[in-house]
């Protein structure tokens, strides 16, 4: 049993829709929790004006009854409130407005228009927009709720705005998690947040943008999710691909993956065992993954986000229609969206973990999954 989904929708279209397949029957869904995650995605110092317009909520259309999954495909939609102001420009039934031809460096505009033989880059940018991550977060919230039934907890924190990385390895404590959730920059240290706000303000003043990095942690994972037998089944590859599939993410790191200058004894984690804890490690440099599989330690993955390429001070470009030099066209955008990207990162990591979990323990009903988990835990002790 695996889970999969498809989404559709444009940034300023009527809404964003998704169909998810493979969730076992019997999972009670907390709709308030789904909407809480959607609100978390909208937070963040440096966000643009659209977040004042949208009040994202997921509307479930199929696959549940009385708040409980049925084993059938789940359909949901997140409506775009801003569509009302754009309905004459972005509509399935009509085209309006002047074509978007001053393509923006760093976006999908040029490559997408040429690939699909389009003369108006709006036909590319509306789908390529990170607005689509709203429905991704709703799906990820379902995955997190499934994992939580088995003691798996997924969280995130921002570790950089601008060039300097914070060195934090352990998953956040409950107190740190509360501070992170209260922060407009998704970080537990207010002094650090103040430094980052100053960087964002400086970029806003010069008409630029700023990127950064975030970590996603997952605790409570059993040993053995994923596989070593084929590259496409390795969980580290799947997680890296999921993170790099998020708009503006340019790199992903597993554990201490970039610290390749260390010697072998300094890079790897020794293995220990005792009757109470089972197999465990005194360190977690691998970030919870070895050989494409979870090793029982907390998962730690990092994603690096580039500065958003839509800027008030535009870069030079070429007009798609005339092929003449011009300046990139500005669209309403964020100065910094790293905190929001961290919530999206949680969602895509949770989805891949839930998928791997159901590959290992899957059944058509949640009770079957629970029995499989119990039997496996007893066997590997």
UniProtKB/Swiss-Prot annotation:
Transmembrane segments: none annotated. FMN binds at residues 127-129, 247-248, 291, 306-310, 332. GO terms for cellular component: cytosol. It is an enzyme of class 4 (lyase). Its EC number is 4.2.3.5. It catalyses: 5-O-(1-carboxyvinyl)-3-phosphoshikimate = chorismate + phosphate. Reduced FMN (FMNH(2)). Pathway: Metabolic intermediate biosynthesis; chorismate biosynthesis; chorismate from D-erythrose 4-phosphate and phosphoenolpyruvate: step 7/7. NADP(+) binds at residues 41, 47. Its cofactor is FMNH2. It comes from the Bacteria. GO terms for molecular function: chorismate synthase activity; FMN binding. Keywords: Amino-acid biosynthesis, Aromatic amino acid biosynthesis, FAD, Flavoprotein, FMN, Lyase, NADP. Residues 272-292 are annotated as: Disordered. Belongs to the chorismate synthase family. NCBIfam families: aroC, PRK05382.1. This reaction introduces a second double bond into the aromatic ring system. Homotetramer. This is Chorismate synthase. It comes from Anaeromyxobacter sp. (strain Fw109-5).
């Amino acid at each position: 049993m695996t889970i999969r989904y498809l989404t559709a929708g444009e940034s300023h279209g009527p809404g964003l829709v998704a169909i998810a397949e493979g969730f076992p029957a019997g999972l009670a869904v907390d709709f308030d929790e789904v909407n809480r995650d959607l609100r978390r995605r909208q937070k963040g110092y440096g966000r643009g004006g659209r977040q004042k317009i949208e009040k994202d909520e997921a509307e479930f259309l199929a696959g549940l009854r009385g708040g409980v999954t049925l084993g059938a495909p789940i359909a949901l939609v997140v409506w775009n409130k801003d569509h009302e102001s754009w309905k004459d420009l972005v509509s399935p039934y009509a085209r309006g407005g002047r074509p978007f031809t001053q393509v923006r460096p760093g976006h999908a505009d040029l490559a997408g228009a040429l690939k699909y033989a389009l003369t108006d880059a709006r036909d590319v940018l509306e789908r390529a927009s990170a607005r689509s991550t709203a429905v991704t977060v709703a799906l990820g919230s379902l995955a997190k709720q499934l994992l939580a039934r088995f003691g798996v907890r997924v969280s995130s924190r921002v570790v950089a705005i601008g060039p300097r990385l914070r060195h934090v390895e352990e998953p956040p404590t409950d107190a740190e998690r509360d501070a992170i959730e209260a922060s407009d920059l998704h970080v537990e240290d207010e002094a650090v947040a103040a430094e980052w706000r100053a960087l964002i303000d400086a970029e806003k003043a010069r008409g630029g943008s700023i990127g950064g990095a975030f970590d996603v942690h997952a605790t409570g994972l059993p040993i053995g999710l994923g596989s070593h037998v084929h590259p496409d089944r390795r969980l580290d590859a799947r997680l890296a691909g999921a993170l790099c599939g998020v708009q503006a993410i340019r790199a992903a790191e597993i554990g201490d993956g970039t610290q390749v200058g260390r010697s072998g004894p300094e890079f790897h984690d020794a293995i220990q065992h005792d009757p109470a804890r089972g197999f465990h490690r005194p360190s977690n440099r691998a970030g919870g993954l070895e050989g494409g599989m979870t090793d029982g330690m907390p998962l730690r993955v990092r994603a690096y986000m580039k500065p958003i390429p839509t800027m008030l001070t535009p870069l030079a470009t070429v007009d798609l229609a005339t092929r003449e030099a011009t300046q990139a066209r500005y669209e309403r955008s964020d100065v910094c969206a790293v905190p929001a990207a961290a919530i999206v990162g949680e969602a895509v990591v949770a989805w891949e973990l839930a998928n791997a979990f159901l590959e290992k323990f899957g059944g058509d009903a949640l009770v079957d999954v629970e029995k499989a988990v119990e039997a496996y835990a007893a066997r590997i002790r």
